[in-house]
């Protein structure tokens, strides 16, 4: 059984991006869906939609590339892991890659980007970084 759906999803996106695939399919969870919502808002992926096959839910992710075929995602890294959780307060959440990257944080108010968490005045578990 798979324990960390976020890591699995990020790895599937990273692998599909390196192979220049148009889409990839992830296992569904609410947290993964929240992370994908942020990735879509920030322009790292084209879109995503929910699908159901054999009474199992999946998320189909449409990846985004520029006109030269380069992926919008340069690097996507899981920070907090099941064996070592990483938490940051609102003051510790910093800009990533001088504002070119995005930190995704799970807070008491839901999953949001690091900038949104700082503005909301909440800290939380740092899920991943993307640039």
Curated annotation (Swiss-Prot):
InterPro entries recorded: Ribosomal_uS8, Ribosomal_uS8_sf
Pfam family example for this protein?
Answer: Ribosomal_S8
Molecular function (GO) terms for this protein are: rRNA binding; structural constituent of ribosome
Q: Which UniProt keywords apply?
A: Ribonucleoprotein, Ribosomal protein, RNA-binding, rRNA-binding
Question: Which GO BP terms apply?
Answer: translation
Q: Which GO terms describe its cellular component?
A: ribonucleoprotein complex; ribosome
Q: Which SUPFAM superfamilies match?
A: Ribosomal protein S8
- Name the family: Belongs to the universal ribosomal protein uS8 family.
Q: How does it assemble?
A: Part of the 30S ribosomal subunit. Contacts proteins S5 and S12.
- Tell me, in a sentence or two, what this protein's role is: One of the primary rRNA binding proteins, it binds directly to 16S rRNA central domain where it helps coordinate assembly of the platform of the 30S subunit.
Q: What NCBIfam families does the entry give?
A: PRK00136.1
Protein name, UniProt field: Small ribosomal subunit protein uS8
Organism from which the protein derives? Campylobacter hominis (strain ATCC BAA-381 / DSM 21671 / CCUG 45161 / LMG 19568 / NCTC 13146 / CH001A)
